[in-house]
Amino acid sequence: KNKPGFDLKEGDKIVSLVSLSMTPLKIEKILSIHKDIDRVDIIGKAILFESALYCKMPEDMSEPLALAALDVAGAPAQARKLPHEGDSVLILGANGKSAVLCGYEAMKKVGPKGKVVGVVRKASQVADLMELGVYTDVIVADCTKPVDVMEAALGVNDGKEYDISICCVNIESCEMSAILPVRDDGLVYFFSMATSFTKAALGAEGIGKDVTMIVGNGYTKNHAEITLNVLRENPKLRKLFDEKYC
């Protein structure tokens, strides 16, 4: 893993892979605020500690594009690591940027005998997501209503529970929608920062689900390169990110 200063020279552009909530910042001047893409341009200083993670700004894509992808780099790297060939994977919040990156990596891992199913709230989102080719199916359900999600999800999986679910919904009370459709000994990955440990742990206990739950660790080995490679490999996803997040 990279450590600050070991392979850098003055003037290099880098992207911190540590959350801003964990990064000491001295903001000297705010230049502009981009509300539509959650970005603020500033003049200032940031402190990266010896254990901090970063990567050099890639030369083959724009800065806004790289930043948009690296913001959620942990998710697609986990989606590459967790599934196996033939698995069924359920991705909640399928329209978000972390979810489409996860879908792409999961599709590669599960292969032609597996399934990657996305869950969205609006029917109007389905056609565009299917066009991306990162899901085998996209279903419409409210992720705060776990029974609705389970019924819709099992309906496109021949009535079978899922091996893995990935929760990318950034709103509260979606824990049970990620847990309920998953089989015993399956895996639930909560990437969303809105996840409540209490709701997830007690909810799984309350319905008698013996599942492994991972709470969204943002770091996975090589996660930055894995995520940037998704945009290099998939022109449709790159176009989506360029249009929506840059």
Sequence positions of predicted segments:
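Glycine-rich beta-strand-centered segment in the early N-terminal region that forms part
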Residues: 1-20
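N-terminal Rossmann-like NAD(P) cofactor-binding module of classical short-chain dehydrogenase/reductase
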Residues: 15, 163-166
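NAD(P)H dinucleotide-binding glycine-rich loop of Rossmann-like/cofactor-binding domains
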Residues: 15-86
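Mid-domain Rossmann-like dinucleotide-binding core that forms the NAD(H)/NADP(H) cofactor-binding site
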Residues: 61-140
